[in-house]
Amino acid sequence: MSILKIQAREIFDSRGNPTIEVDLYTKKGLFRAAVPSGASTGIYEALELRDNDKTRFLGKGVSKAVEHVNKTIAPALVNKNVSVVEQEKIDKLMIEMDGSENKSKFGANAILGVSLAVCKAGAAEKDIPLYRHIADLAGNKEVILPVPAFNVINGGSHAGNKLAMQEFMILPIGAECFKEAMRIGAEVYHNLKNVIKEKYGKDATNVGDEGGFAPNILENKEALELLKTAISKAGYADKIVIGMDVAASEFYRDGKYDLDFKSPDDRSRYITPDQLADLYKGFVKNYPVVSIEDPFDQDDWPAWKKFTAESGIQVVGDDLTVTNPKRIAKAVQEKSCNCLLLKVNQIGSVTESLQACKLAQSNGWGVMVSHRSGETEDTFIADLVVGLCTGQIKTGAPCRSERLAKYNQLLRIEEELGSKARFAGRNFRNPRVN
């Protein structure tokens, strides 16, 4: 069925910054999608078009991207009479119209908004749930509920504390189903709140952009200790593992790393990639850390390769790979990591996101679907992770509605699947499909 009308507008993300929302109409009704936005962005990401008009939203408006949808993309798609089930055809058309390497003409945010709305409309056109439509587009017969990675302690560019490393996550891999994983996550979260309150005072339990706590600690090991204590207090030591997102590009300085980068600069405290790798190995040895994302800078290829070969854990590429098939192909060739972080707005279309996922999976990598720190109430990625069978998702702490929107949608999907629901559990790195 063809597209009758497309209307884009400026709305607000969870940080109070403008972002783009797209309404797409077919005879089946209205399909709405909103685009997220990141704080710690990789330099190789597709371009998020901002107005840079300092008199309006401090330069962060997206009225140009909105205009590109309303004045250029919308008329083209309506006139072309393409069917909303033809996801790849529509995405290709928009990418060709943009004509740039990184979607800088229209903005990845403009193209993605339309792409997401098309995908939702395509599912309705086929009278199937969105996750099933995504599974069809990806060629998957099965669907799998993911293990949630709850970001419960925030540091780095997501928090106003001294902590260098950006995210400390709990993964309830020992749960029997997604619903139980949510309960475990929530219970540990509340235990953690009490542990932090007792140790650092009530104001230390204020939450960061993704709903995690941001106590003013400097030592990354201290964050792991807090998690260990909360997990054991909740009684889930046998059911939970820990994941980290270091976001090391944020504190990479002239070939070295500054673990106190939020303090005045002092070169004498910089450490080498090898010293940083040793620190990680200590974490893995002393805590149940099974996954580390962005352990090194996005261009520090030798450090990535060495650590992935030596560590034996899941090493996740985010800034390194930016959901871009070309960067992923290079990382596969270099053996730089073994898991892709999939963020739809890094590449800017549903079709390319699916291609990135398939490329990673076909090379034996794991894939973790991810939100951004600036989120909306849109729940697309919940259906995406189920349809792509990646087995793992990170979309914040069990706190803040823009995070819970995704987790709650996953609860609904699990309920809808009933006895057919499969939960990735301990196989989260490679949930066997078919």
From Swiss-Prot:
Residues that bind substrate: 158, 167, 293, 318, 370-373, 394
A GO molecular-function descriptor: phosphopyruvate hydratase activity
Identification of the protein by name: Alpha-enolase
Intracellular or extracellular location(s): Cytoplasm
Family statement drawn from the similarity comment of this UniProt entry: Belongs to the enolase family.
Keyword Magnesium tagged: yes
Obligatory cofactor(s): Mg(2+)
NCBIfam families with a match to the protein in the record: eno
